């Protein structure tokens, strides 16, 4: 059976559109409908990519894009590709504007003004998810904080913890075989933090990780020579960037976060 899929596209967090889509999808208990959110869309290239995915997966696109140019582009692109695209917010904005003789601001994310603190936290959490593990280097220059380190140095849990403090965090893994994204070298040193760890501690953590996955704990991932190679490369990268380095060997995530936040306040 083909999957039933709806892409939820938004120039903000996408919570509004997702709630509407899930409310509609809840009427079809016998045939579950999967919802995939695509938040913080800022360019037409991303819209075109979503349309291509929707066409390939025979999916529907539901969207909240407040900028008319972006709405019109998505609707035109979807029509050209034979994809169903449903505008959740646009028609209502236009009706309100016409009936009440008001001019819309056409600015994404205005609903967050209703509860700025709460929504800042949600936005930061979503940011941390979107820009986790170096998956999109565009987030590096948009972040309040950038974390770098080799695998298993708590980059992801630390990013999430800081996100709950309403800080937008991107994290980037440092791997000898992969050139760091050029954006890393354009970040101000005051917002980039390298997470350092002792070889012995990292070896122990990685072996436990492999065991938990049911894998051989003697794999190259948990080899001491490999670990030393990764840490040496990490040292080269942080030296080139000139960022602060925090030793996380025996630190809890909360302790590391506290150090980072104190440094940010300087």
Curated annotation (Swiss-Prot):
Q: What class of enzyme is it?
A: transferase
Keywords noted in UniProt: Kinase, Nucleotide-binding, Serine/threonine-protein kinase, Transferase
> What does the record give as the reaction this protein catalyses?
N(tele)-phospho-L-histidyl/L-threonyl-[pyruvate, phosphate dikinase] + ADP = N(tele)-phospho-L-histidyl/O-phospho-L-threonyl-[pyruvate, phosphate dikinase] + AMP + H(+); N(tele)-phospho-L-histidyl/O-phospho-L-threonyl-[pyruvate, phosphate dikinase] + phosphate + H(+) = N(tele)-phospho-L-histidyl/L-threonyl-[pyruvate, phosphate dikinase] + diphosphate
Its organism's taxonomic lineage begins at:
Bacteria, Bacillati, Bacillota, Bacilli, Bacillales
Q: What is its EC number?
A: 2.7.11.32, 2.7.4.27
What is this protein's function per UniProt?
A: Bifunctional serine/threonine kinase and phosphorylase involved in the regulation of the pyruvate, phosphate dikinase (PPDK) by catalyzing its phosphorylation/dephosphorylation.
Q: Which residues bind ADP?
A: 149-156
Q: Which protein, by its recorded name, is this?
A: Putative pyruvate, phosphate dikinase regulatory protein
Query: InterPro entries from the entry?
Result: Kinase-pyrophosphorylase, PPDK_reg
The record's annotation in HAMAP family points to: PDRP (MF_00921)
Short name of one Pfam family for this protein?
Kinase-PPPase
Q: Which family does it belong to?
A: Belongs to the pyruvate, phosphate/water dikinase regulatory protein family. PDRP subfamily.
Where does this protein have coiled-coil stretches? Answer: none
Q: Which domain of life is it from?
A: Bacteria
Example of a GO MF term: phosphotransferase activity, phosphate group as acceptor
**Organism the protein comes from:** Geobacillus kaustophilus (strain HTA426)
């Amino acid at each position: 059976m083909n999957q039933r899929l709806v892409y939820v596209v938004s120039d903000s967090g996408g919570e509004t559109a997702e709630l509407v889509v899930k409310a509609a999808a809840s009427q079809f208990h016998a045939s579950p409908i999967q919802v995939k959110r695509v938040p913080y869309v800022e360019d037409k290239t991303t819209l075109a990519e979503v349309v291509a995915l929707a066409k390939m997966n025979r999916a529907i696109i539901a969207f909240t894009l407040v900028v008319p140019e972006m709405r019109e582009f998505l609707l035109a692109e979807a029509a050209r590709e034979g994809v169903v695209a449903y505008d959740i917010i646009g028609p209502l904005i236009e009706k309100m504007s016409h009936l009440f003789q008001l001019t819309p601001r056409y600015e994404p994310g205005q609903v967050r003004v209703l509860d700025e603190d709460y929504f800042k936290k949600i936005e930061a959490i979503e940011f941390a998810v979107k820009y986790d593990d170096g998956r999109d280097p565009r987030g590096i220059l948009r972040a309040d904080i950038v974390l770098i380190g080799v695998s298993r140095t708590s980059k992801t849990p630390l990013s999430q913890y800081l996100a709950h403090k309403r800080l937008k965090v991107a994290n980037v893994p440092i791997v000898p075989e992969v050139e760091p994204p050029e954006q890393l070298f354009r970040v101000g040193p005051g917002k980039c933090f390298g997470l350092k760890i002792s070889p012995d501690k990292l070896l122990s953590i990685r072996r436990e990780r492999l065991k938990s996955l049911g894998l051989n704990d003697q794999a190259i991932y948990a080899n001491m020579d490999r670990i030393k190679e990764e840490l040496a490369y990490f040292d080269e990268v942080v030296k080139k960037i000139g960022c602060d380095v925090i030793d996380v060997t025996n630190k809890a995530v909360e302790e590391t976060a506290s150090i980072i936040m104190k440094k940010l306040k300087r």
